[in-house]
Amino acid sequence: MEEYHRHCDEVGFNAEEAHNIVKECVDGVLGGEDYNHNNINQWTASIVEQSLTHLVKLGKAYKYIVTCAVVQKSAYGFHTASSCFWDTTSDGTCTVRWENRTMNCIVNVFAIAIVL
């Protein structure tokens, strides 16, 4: 039996397209807001859900993982890292960094190609 492999439009993950989608979602949720601990759960849930919805609507053969962290600005800063073991020709990631005067937001998108 011959196997058929579809590799996400044969060009790999479009990180710029994903970055633009996520940035719009973050701007829509956090734009104009000041840090408020009581709103963090709602904000982060909205950002990941909206981002995921828009990414899936692209209709590409990927499974997506979206993470979001929002932290209050302070003198201590904010550092994060991630690592993946995957097929770099078809899978990909993008990170969106967003900030205003009161908070920082980091959103990571991991896209894993679905091979059929």
UniProtKB/Swiss-Prot annotation:
Keywords: Cell cycle, Cell division, Centromere, Chromosome, Cytoplasm, Cytoskeleton, Dynein, Kinetochore, Microtubule, Mitosis, Motor protein, Nitration, Nucleus, Transport. Acts as one of several non-catalytic accessory components of the cytoplasmic dynein 1 complex that are thought to be involved in linking dynein to cargos and to adapter proteins that regulate dynein function. Cytoplasmic dynein 1 acts as a motor for the intracellular retrograde motility of vesicles and organelles along microtubules. Probably binds BUB3 as part of transport cargo. Required for the efficient progression through mitosis. InterPro entries: Tctex-1-like, Tctex-1-like_sf. Homodimer. The cytoplasmic dynein 1 complex consists of two catalytic heavy chains (HCs) and a number of non-catalytic subunits presented by intermediate chains (ICs), light intermediate chains (LICs) and light chains (LCs); the composition seems to vary in respect to the IC, LIC and LC composition. The heavy chain homodimer serves as a scaffold for the probable homodimeric assembly of the respective non-catalytic subunits. The ICs and LICs bind directly to the HC dimer and the LCs assemble on the IC dimer. DYNLT1 and DYNLT3 compete for association with dynein IC (DYNC1I1 or DYNC1I2). GO terms for biological process: cell division; microtubule-based movement; positive regulation of mitotic cell cycle; regulation of mitotic cell cycle. It comes from the Eukaryota. This is Dynein light chain Tctex-type 3. Its main location: nucleus. The modification 3'-nitrotyrosine is found at Y4. The lineage of its organism: Eukaryota, Metazoa, Chordata, Craniata, Vertebrata. One of its GO terms (molecular function) is dynein intermediate chain binding. Signal peptide: none annotated. It is found in: Nucleus; Cytoplasm, Cytoskeleton; Chromosome, Centromere, Kinetochore. One of its GO terms (cellular component) is cytoplasm. Belongs to the dynein light chain Tctex-type family.
